Amino acid sequence: MSKPLIEVKDLKVYFKQKSPKLLSFKPGILKAVDQVSFSIEKGKTFGLVGESGSGKSTIGKAILRYHKPTGGEIFYEGTEIGAMGEKELLPYRKKMQSVFQDPYSSLDPSHTVQDIICEPMEIH
C-alpha cells in the first residue's frame, strides 16, 4: 500500500474566545476541531461533510496552514507540514486547494436523508 497523499492525525484547532463565557471570569476556549484523523489516497476524491459550524472549513484551512493547528500532525506525501514556517509551506500550498461548500447545495439537518435525495426527483 502506498503512502497517502494527505494524512491528518489527531488534528486539533482551538481558538481563544475574546469575551468570557456567561457567568465565567476566565476567557473560554472554542474547540473548533478536536482530534480529527483521516487520510486521502492519491487519485481519490474526498468529501468532508457536516453541519454548519462543525469545523469543515477550519480543517481545510488548518491543512493549508491558514489556521495554526493546536495539536496533531499533518502530512503531505509523507512530509510533516504541520509545523513548517510560511516560506517552507509555499511549494506545498501551490499543490493543494480547498473547495468550500456551496450553501445552496448543503445538507439541511431539519430534513431526512430520504427527503434530501427525493427532492430533486419531485421537482422534476
Where are these regions (language model features)?
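ABC transporter nucleotide-binding domains
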Residues: 1-124
